[in-house]
Regions:
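N-terminal targeting signals for export/organelle localization
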Residues: 1-46
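Short secondary-structure boundary/capping segments
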Residues: 34-35, 54-56, 119-121, 158-159
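Short loop/turn microsegments at loop-to-beta-strand junctions
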Residues: 40-41, 63, 164-165
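Hydrophobic alpha-helical segments, especially N-terminal targeting/anchoring helices
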Residues: 46-47, 168
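Short active-site neighborhood of thiol/selenol oxidoreductases, capturing the structured segment around
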Residues: 53-83, 99
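Structural microenvironment flanking redox-active thiols in thiol-disulfide oxidoreductases
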Residues: 80-140
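Thiol/disulfide oxidoreductase modules built on the thioredoxin-like
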Residues: 134-168
Length: 168
């Protein structure tokens, strides 16, 4: 009886140790891996402070992206309220940032983006408001962030307007 008890104990000790090994140090074969859907293309925009911001500034960071415009009266205020909640949860994460791109760069100048960021009380070290050339902003929205179907692109950039309720 002693040998049988010892064998059972040994079996369960090995089983528990094996379980903990695979749980904490072993392969992550059981973890779900997210597929890469798109890569960010090279770009350069201006922040609310007039500083350049490029795709290289996003390297190694988890980034939440949105498109909005400062004089929007429909979905944008609600989106930015939701974005404030996201920011509150992740603001202390060292590799987290939010990028709010304008979809109306003719009106949303650097100065206007600064006023808007200040009105939200945004911490602009980790939540940046970006403006730039309309064709560049829209190209990145479609090709990198997948916020709009590239088939929606019209011949004239002046006739285009991306206004979406989605975050990327």
């Amino acid at each position: 009886m002693n040998k049988k008890l010892f064998a059972y104990l040994l079996f369960f000790v090995v089983l528990v140790l094996g379980f903990y090994y695979f749980l904490f140090r072993g392969n992550d074969f059981w973890r779900t891996k997210l597929p890469v859907i798109s890569y960010t293309k090279p770009f350069e925009f201006k922040t609310q402070d007039g500083l350049p911001f490029t795709d290289r500034d996003m390297l190694g960071k988890v980034t939440v992206v949105e498109y909005f415009f400062t004089n929007c009266k429909s979905i944008c205020p609600k989106m930015n309220t939701n974005m404030k909640e996201i920011f509150a949860v992740y603001k202390d994460e060292p590799n987290f940032m939010i990028l709010s791109h304008t979809c109306d760069p003719e009106r949303d100048t650097v100065a206007r983006m600064k006023v808007y960021a200040d009105s939200l009380g945004a911490d602009t070290r980790k939540w940046l408001f970006l403006t730039g050339r309309k064709d560049s902003l829209y190209n990145i929205a479609r090709s990198a962030y997948l916020l709009d179907d590239p088939k929606n692109s019209l011949d004239k950039i002046e006739d285009q307007f991306i206004h979406t309720q989605f975050f990327a």
